[in-house]
């Protein structure tokens, strides 16, 4: 469905370190960049995720009610995402990492805010 998602970052280096750590815990390589517009990219064959300063020159701000979810291959990877993200400047939010059961079955989730306030999570579908 998506080709890429880009979020704004006020401190590119702090955000790059956060995503290198958190996405690295999910098995991704460090971000590539900066590109000519100062963005860093994490790519998979399914799509890409990027951070950068807003092109309009205004400060980056997070989406109130928005979340970007990254897939994990195990509950251990979800916990590793959380631990690495917190150690790299992310802020713990919502419930602690763990299982939640709802209309989509049982999920293992961990939620963080990146250094610019963007809400991200790691998700593993249990069973």
Regions found by a protein language model. Name each.
Residues 1-16, 68, 123-127:
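N-terminal beta-strand motif that seeds the catalytic metal site of vicinal oxygen chelate
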Residues 9-14, 70-116:
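Vicinal oxygen chelate
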Residues 27-32, 98-101, 123-127:
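Conserved catalytic-core motifs of GNAT/GCN5-like acyltransferases
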Residues 41-46, 112-115, 125:
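Active-site beta-strand termini and strand-to-loop segments that position acidic
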